[in-house]
């Protein structure tokens, strides 16, 4: 079946480490607008921001992007995009949903497109991205999520686990997980119907819910790592990059 993708960018106002980060100014524009612009350049067709706050919606619409209001009570970004999808596509025109996190202002269209590649395998439920870790301090940084996976090819892993710890042990590369997901629509529906899992709650990583329920996640390995904004330090780094 041909993939018919839509990009949905979840953006909530609440953030414990960096309050209201979606609206943080970077090179004259809110961070969420930078992400929406890059997603639109991927040229899949429709790109929409799903948010829980009118200030974010106003900012997104002011720059000419589509936005939809969603509940403020969602447990995860995937739950938010599922609500948005049901509102905007009740006819089920889209069978593939790309969840591009709203705190990746340096993401490129190429990286977004790369997230679709693992779905060429019909056995894959969810696709995502990773990159080899080259900075020593990132190997022990709990904010850098690592992928434990079995190689399928030179640029592809089947994910077995995701962790904030330094893993796997021993010689060999470590891989940094990049927060973009491409879901088959049926996989997203299954995922959001599941209760948060034990390891998901322990690691605070929603993708573990899928693995704990035997869903298959394949990872496309790319050469670059878009900078995620979780802290004020990250924000200042991004401001210098995009200045």
From Swiss-Prot:
Q: In which pathway does it act?
A: Nucleotide-sugar biosynthesis; CMP-3-deoxy-D-manno-octulosonate biosynthesis; CMP-3-deoxy-D-manno-octulosonate from 3-deoxy-D-manno-octulosonate and CTP: step 1/1; Bacterial outer membrane biogenesis; lipopolysaccharide biosynthesis
The residues that cross the membrane are none
Q: Which SUPFAM superfamilies match?
A: Nucleotide-diphospho-sugar transferases
Gene3D superfamilies, per this entry?
Spore Coat Polysaccharide Biosynthesis Protein SpsA, Chain A
Q: What is its EC number?
A: 2.7.7.38
Lyase recorded as keyword = no
Tell me the keywords, alphabetical order.
Cytoplasm, Lipopolysaccharide biosynthesis, Nucleotidyltransferase, Transferase
* MF (Gene Ontology): 3-deoxy-manno-octulosonate cytidylyltransferase activity
* Reactions listed under catalytic activity: 3-deoxy-alpha-D-manno-oct-2-ulosonate + CTP = CMP-3-deoxy-beta-D-manno-octulosonate + diphosphate
> What's its top-level EC category?
transferase
What's one GO-annotated cellular component?
Answer: cytosol
Subcellular location, principal: cytoplasm
Q: Which biological process, per GO, is one annotated for this protein?
A: lipopolysaccharide biosynthetic process
Check the UniProt entry and state the signal peptide residues, or none: none
Role played = Activates KDO (a required 8-carbon sugar) for incorporation into bacterial lipopolysaccharide in Gram-negative bacteria.
Give the similarity note: Belongs to the KdsB family.
State the protein's name. Answer: 3-deoxy-manno-octulosonate cytidylyltransferase
